[in-house]
Amino acid sequence: MPREIITCQVGQCGNQIGMEFWKQLCMEHGISPEGILEEYALDGEDRKDVFFYQADDEHYVPRAVLIDLEPGVIKQIQNSPYSNLYNPENFFVSKTMDGAGNNWAKGYCEGAKYEEEIIEMIDREADGSDSLEGFVLTHSIAGGTGSGFGSYLLEKLNDHYPKKLVQTYSVFPNDNDIVVQPYNCILSMKRLVLNADCVVVLDNTAITSIAVDRLKLLHPTISQVNSIVSTVMAASTTTLRYPGYMNNDLVGLIASLVPTPRCHFLMTGYTPLSLNDQKVSSIRKTTVLDVMRRLLQTRNIMTSGAIKKGAYMSILNIIQGDVDPTQVHKSLQRIRERNVANFIPWGPASIQVALSKKSPYIESDNKVSGLMLANHTGIRSIFQVLYGQYRQFRKRDAFLGTYRETKIFQDNLDEFDSSEEVVKDLIDEYAAAEKMDYINRGKDDEDMDYDPRAPPNFRPIE
């Protein structure tokens, strides 16, 4: 029985990458832009029901809720060839339609204002599921709606669905995209630490660099960058949609990658990479060894500078294509012999591999492709940059006027201080994880097992 997942797309960025994600899923499952299953896909062995449901007229509808405080991107989706794909009841745009003004606090307060309407949409989707496993949130942490409204939604998902998993695809910004983004990022990070079970970090800077360096795009468009993101998202869900012997549900996927509850931020790598509209002249033979070796190369990691220092806590390679399992074993041996991956001293130094089918409905230039999902202590470098930028602003109490105008900050700035502490603790946690004595850390502290900052939903597999 498929374990259903509901996708919540919040804000401009969240809806843009969500739109590309659904385009990709439709192509992979043989579903037309109107939601009709193509004749050539009638006998497919895939699990469409994880992310789609069938309406009474049998057309496929995404299990998705689309939220924004301004109408721009939602209207774009409603006017696109995919307009009839979505449930029209699951679009939400605020009545004022004036956005959050790149202000986390305004987005958060708007979330509280419209909580009842949003939860009603989500409840309706949940009631239509036979065995709901959890939620996926797509958003940016830099602006106002994705960060603020997204933060509020994360808290409410924990409150209303405490036993369901929450995974996010969170876009981390380019430098200085928005003046007040250090504030928005720190406030969002607190919720990603406390209220998500797993966060896939989508580093805009690194993804744009990959588009320039590897895809040879001189000036990558937002659509092209989002297409790369959708490729990663789709690949990370292939084991759920084309199930094999392992990692065929969300809890199994997360448990294999998150050894301790707080350290649940993942980086990604993908190879070989191309865009759907880009013809690639193939000059190499893709093998399992070639793909797995390339996934460990810095230039293929979609997180800036994160693996130059530190160690891997876990690696899961999702290999797609017609692959002989004996090739996997030989490839792992070769990689181990070359010692190309540095692991933490207190855990197993192993790369997990999940084999998955490729969609038979998409012509691929390569026989084998791979996605790496990795938990690496070096990811804290991204958090350190955000923390440093935030501290520079707070020293001068710069640009706080619009925050003080909102209910959450009108009396004091305690929420900033609380968020700062959570992020600092996260940075310290990842640094400590590089040391042999990490597993004994805090053993004398009776409250360690009841860390209030640990995600409430984390349930390790026995």
From Swiss-Prot:
Q: Cross-referenced InterPro entries, in alphabetical order?
A: Gamma_tubulin, Tub_FtsZ_C, Tubulin, Tubulin/FtsZ-like_C, Tubulin/FtsZ_2-layer-sand-dom, Tubulin/FtsZ_GTPase_sf, Tubulin_C, Tubulin_CS
SMART domains attached to this UniProt entry: Tubulin, Tubulin_C
Instruction: Output a single Gene Ontology CC term carried by this record.
Output: centrosome
Fetch the CDD domains from UniProt.
Answer: gamma_tubulin
Tell me one Pfam family matched here: Tubulin
Task: Classify the main location.
Answer: cytoplasm
Sorted alphabetically, the keyword list is: Cytoplasm, Cytoskeleton, GTP-binding, Microtubule, Nucleotide-binding
Q: Is GTP-binding tagged as a keyword?
A: yes
Does this UniProt record's set of keywords contain GTP-binding? yes
Question: Single Gene Ontology BP term?
Answer: cytoplasmic microtubule organization
Query: Where is this chain's protein located in or outside the cell?
Result: Cytoplasm, Cytoskeleton, Microtubule organizing center, Centrosome
Disordered as annotated region, ranges: 441-462
Compositional bias, Pro residues, is annotated for 453-462
GO MF term list: GTP binding
Q: Which family does it belong to?
A: Belongs to the tubulin family.
Protein name, per record: Tubulin gamma-2 chain
UniProt organism field: Euplotes crassus
